[in-house]
Amino acid sequence: MGLALEKVCFLGVIFLISACTVKKEGVKNLSYKHESLRAYENAKDYDPTTKKAAYKRNFFERHFKRYSDSQDSNTKDQPLDNGMRDSSSIQRATMRPYQVGGKWYYPTKVDLGEKFDGVASWYGPNFHAKKTSNGEIYNMYAHTAAHKTLPMNTVVKVINVDNNLSTIVRINDRGPFVSDRIIDLSNAAARDIDMVKKGTASVRLIVLGFGGVISTQYEQSFNASSSKILHKEFKVGESEKSVSGGKFSLQMGAFRNQIGAQTLADKLQAENPNYSVKVAFKDDLYKVLVQGFQSEEEARDFMKKYNQNAVLTRE
């Protein structure tokens, strides 16, 4: 009898220990989809229908701990354009070079209509109601996004190239810090292009405007194709043609032959699409100029890679 009782007690203890273990299902598979340093933890187990983390709670959570919805203190009922920070001082601060994981990133010049291709990911509940890189409060129900180098408040159209669905977002954060990702979308934007479940999507970005405003040249297409919610968040107006990305430039070479200068310029432009490369004729020479550096340090990093004897000038 005593031995049988000991057996029952032992099995009971084993059951309690196993019951107390949190079971996060599918983490390995989903972690691949959300490798962004910023987005991975909150996106992997997110269920957009309940707006809660969809994991099995352990024994103590089920019986003694009440689930908290405090992360939804910032909700879709609030104004979605609430808190846009567009002062010139904040804009300048967020255009400075910064370092993440030992790698330097250089916010840079961008032109209206410029296009970028790459992979998008998304981030949601665990960052909801927390501060973004420019000091705004992140609202996952709003159409915003994180980008490593685009100027803050740049407005871009995001097209899912696999299904041709599109949305519009305003850049208000930095990331994703994964080499093959070019943009981290809010949950609302990710749902627009049907990529929440998959986690990532191949996308094309088109710059529509700056300062949170869509340029008038895109007004017709915006009115024709955009949803009501996007019309509440974005307005059409006069927008700059470009946002300057720097005050330094490099003269990478000077040629008597225009063909030689153009060959170098084409090579540098192809390898560095975020900079402006041009050939200027001056003093009987064709000079190859690279523009758009945010700082002297950034320009000197470029020199180390291509030409230590390049001439550094302030624009």
Curated annotation (Swiss-Prot):
Please, where does N-palmitoyl cysteine lipid attachment map on the chain?
Answer: 20
The cellular location(s) given in this protein's UniProt record come to:
Cell membrane
Q: Where is this region: Disordered?
A: 68-92
Q: Which domain of life is it from?
A: Bacteria
Signal peptide, first to last residue: 1-19
Q: Name the UniProt key words of this record, in alphabetical order.
A: Cell membrane, Cell wall biogenesis/degradation, Lipoprotein, Lyase, Membrane, Palmitate, Signal
List the biased-composition ranges (Basic and acidic residues).
68-79
Tell me which residues bear the S-diacylglycerol cysteine lipid modification.
20
EC number(s) stated in the UniProt entry for this protein: 4.2.2.-
Membrane topology reported for the UniProt record: Lipid-anchor
Q: Where is the SPOR domain?
A: 242-315
The record, for CDD domains, names: DPBB_RlpA-like (cd22268)
Q: Which GO terms describe its molecular function?
A: lytic endotransglycosylase activity; peptidoglycan binding
Query: What is the role of the protein in this entry?
Result: Lytic transglycosylase with a strong preference for naked glycan strands that lack stem peptides.
Q: Which family does it belong to?
A: Belongs to the RlpA family.
| PANTHER family listed in its UniProt record | ENDOLYTIC PEPTIDOGLYCAN TRANSGLYCOSYLASE RLPA (PTHR34183:SF1)
Q: What is this protein called?
A: Endolytic peptidoglycan transglycosylase RlpA
Q: Which organism is it from?
A: Helicobacter pylori (strain ATCC 700392 / 26695) (Campylobacter pylori)
Give me the gene this protein comes from.
rlpA
